[in-house]
Amino acid sequence: MNILLTGGTGLIGKALVERLCLRNEQVTILTRSSSPHTLSKHKNIKFITALSQLNSQEQFDAIINLAGEPIFHKVWSKNQKSILRESRLSLTTQLVEFINQYQQHPIFISGSATGIYGDQDEQKITETSKTAKTFTAQLCQDWENIAQQANGRVCLIRTGMVFSTKGGALAKILPFYKWGLGGKLGKGEQYFPWIALEDMVNGILFLLDHSECRGAFNFAAPKSIKQHKFNRTLAQLLKRPAFATIPKWLLHFILGERANLLLESQNVVPEKLLNAGFQFQYADCENYLEDILKNK
């Protein structure tokens, strides 16, 4: 396959590119960075910084859109919210226009997030569950609406928190737990959807290979976990205390609106992936944590 990938130098993108190269696919990575990448060692990868650099005759079998300004890294000022929207909506619009100019339309796999559902307490969330009206939920809805304007097969990946020791949220919090500084966020009763990086990549490849798959897919492990249970499990595996509790008011004081990402409860189920026959390597967070810490 000939594949165009955005976000190819991020945590998910790099892992995906490695797998695509093992499959001997041809990969073109659209990136804002002009610096050399470790991925450039692969002979079947090329880098571009704008769609205009592509040959007008070049035909892609699939376009995978993973690009976007990191959602949690900076305070959500009015300007930052504009950047978060622009980095997703503008590029996705360009990609849709690029796809629709061809008679043979490539598969379009485009990013989204489980944040589209907002806080739903204990209720199980599937792809048909109601969406919310928060900033992140509206961002995801607008992002998906643009992607769905592409002709051909479109898959939307509503991603939970991606776990890996190579980067992302888990890699950032591990040192704090090793220092005995782990703890509950609020009451700790909130579910948070998570997915192992390995399953994230396998899921994208599954969508590529299964032409019957289309529409929105929850990319989260079958078993969401409550924050207090995650906290206790990780602390026990590391043999460290984790008695701290950060109250909701303090999280909101420190993080502002971003605190909602840590406090919303989302018991997400990957119903469509499971019904399509996808098998998760890591369905249970406790088993996943035990496995990665044993091999770290």
Swiss-Prot record:
<dbReference type="InterPro" id="IPR001509">
    <property type="entry name" value="Epimerase_deHydtase"/>
</dbReference>
<dbReference type="InterPro" id="IPR010099">
    <property type="entry name" value="SDR39U1"/>
</dbReference>
<dbReference type="Pfam" id="PF01370">
    <property type="entry name" value="Epimerase"/>
</dbReference>
<comment type="similarity">
    <text>Belongs to the NAD(P)-dependent epimerase/dehydratase family. SDR39U1 subfamily.</text>
</comment>
<dbReference type="Pfam" id="PF08338">
    <property type="entry name" value="DUF1731"/>
</dbReference>
<dbReference type="InterPro" id="IPR036291">
    <property type="entry name" value="NAD(P)-bd_dom_sf"/>
</dbReference>
<protein>
    <recommendedName>
        <fullName>Epimerase family protein HI_1208</fullName>
    </recommendedName>
</protein>
<dbReference type="InterPro" id="IPR013549">
    <property type="entry name" value="DUF1731"/>
</dbReference>
